[in-house]
From Swiss-Prot:
Organism domain of life: Eukaryota
Location (main, coarse): cytoplasm
Biological process annotations from GO: GTP metabolic process; positive regulation of mRNA catabolic process; translational elongation
Name of the protein in its database record: GTP-binding protein 1
Region annotated G5, chain positions: 355-357
Organism: Xenopus laevis
Taxonomic lineage: Eukaryota, Metazoa, Chordata, Craniata, Vertebrata
Amino acid sequence: MASLASSQTEPNTSESPVPASMFSPEPDGEDSDCSLDGEPLRNGEADIDVTSKFVLVSPSAEQYDSLLHQLRDRMDEGRGETIYVIGQGSDGTEYGLNEADMEASVATVTSMAEQIVADMILLREHQEAGGKVQDYLVRKSVGDNDFLEVRVAVVGNVDAGKSTLLGVLTHGELDNGRGFARQKLFRHKHEIESGRTSSVGNDILGFDNHGQVVNKPDNHGGSLEWTKICEKSSKIITFIDLAGHEKYLKTTVFGMTGHLPDFCMLMVGSNAGIVGMTKEHLGLALALNVPVFVVVTKIDMCPANILQETLKLLQRLLKSPGCRKIPVLVQNKDDVIVTASNFSSERMCPIFQISNVTGENLDLLKMFLNLLSPRSSSREEEPAEFQIDDTYSVPGVGTVVSGTTLRGLIKLNDLLLLGPDPLGNFTSIAVKSIHRKRMPVKEVRGGQTASFALKKIKRSTIRKGMVMVSPRLNPQASWEFEAEILVLHHPTTISPRYQAMVHCGSIRQTATILTMSRDCLRTGDKAIVHFRFIKTPEYLHIDQRLVFREGRTKAVGTITKLLQSTNNLPMNSKPPQQVKMQSTKKSLHGKKDEQSPAAAVTEEASPSAAAIGVTAGAGAMQAQPKTGGGGRRRGGQRHKVKAQGACTASTGGC
């Protein structure tokens, strides 16, 4: 954005927050990134003048078609919605229209919205030098069982008020200051007792086509019926409530990588300030390229000087070289509209100050959430791909998987490939039913979360990290891959054979470093690293983001190359750890036609050993007591040794 770029160095030199008005377009300058009605057209239509603020009053047929084409493009860019400003042009004239011109312009925009089947919501009306200026939210109308979905991850240090804020937003009741609101969200008994979230929670906030909240809790139990909310809503905000405590960091990282949030809401307690895991969670969101906005809570109980100190530290953190954000303090509806329309640039960081007890500024936060547009883009003609982040076994239904549709279109009774299994194979399965937010639907598109009931498959064969893909993709699982990683923190040095947990989408598995482009890695180093999974192969993509962590060690990176596919390996080829584990578990004294995995590997590696037959089997039986650890460690092993000695003597193996 032109105005943002021109002022980039200005706000970074001061400690005061940046006013939101600086991001508004200048009356005498052109700003192609702002949502003006006079935006110059591309695609060879620049000869039709639509830069004047009066073009909407009585447009010609050519101008009307150009404006309609422009609105369609902006709706596509905004994933189904955009902010349209009436009374502003980019031809240098002063802003504002008189009453009659404004009425005619609104009628023109309403006509265009009807053509593209969209609703208009008046956001604000303000007076300028030339008259009135009105801002409208144009949102695409959806069907009865469809809605726009925006996922917001809620992170922050423990006791910052994450669950309390979500309880107030979703249930519409203010908190009593003693944990009343958060009790409605907890899923486990120990969470209710301790007041701390330990699992990934999901809560929804619905907005209708007029921008009003539709959440109405049940009068008796106080619970929310998701089906009724989805039926009334044109837009759903899905909150991913993550744990703030350090010991649940693994769960928080999985929520950020596996649930694919569009935005991240960082919670900061005004009385405690930036402490504990606040910087960790902010760094994680920045590493995954998720836009962040900040909510400062508990302003009703915090002294003014402490609140100002917290805001000053927060602005200093956001402007630091690691973040390079532009903090904007949101204080009124004008600030909300300006920040929401420019938030997708990922440079601006709005800061809200709220109280869950008094309800102060909660209306500004709800308005901002209503204006957020989903960031994920996907075309329906692409091959379908769905990542699994949880599994269930529902009585009377069978196996159910939940997760996120990454791309494409999935319909009822579609045949998909589920995998990879421990051998890297994919199994054909059929979709029995589809639910979105507990509401039955017939199809899901890219960027939407859903649950599928699958036919004729056991829950035990499915794990987190598996995918369901279209057969057109011809999927292949990989044991090894290369990634370019940046070490954010490590106490000493990282060298080959180092093992740590890799988070990549919904995948969460330990991987070993085989080789690196540098001898060793320290904090701040960047290198190309060759990884190998230790347990099962996974389905990966080039340019997929990953988080590499173990204890206090943290690194982020991007996959650059997939090195090895299981389709190119023998069926019995597994990592050495698995082969060794199986060879010690299974006894060699079974039926004569049975063969141990260790013997199978030996036979695969050496054809001569397979030709010898009995002698090779006797040699394997002789070696077994040694690998088992001696006769005294395993019950009854000494008798087996005697039996083996008699067997080898009779066959001449000795």
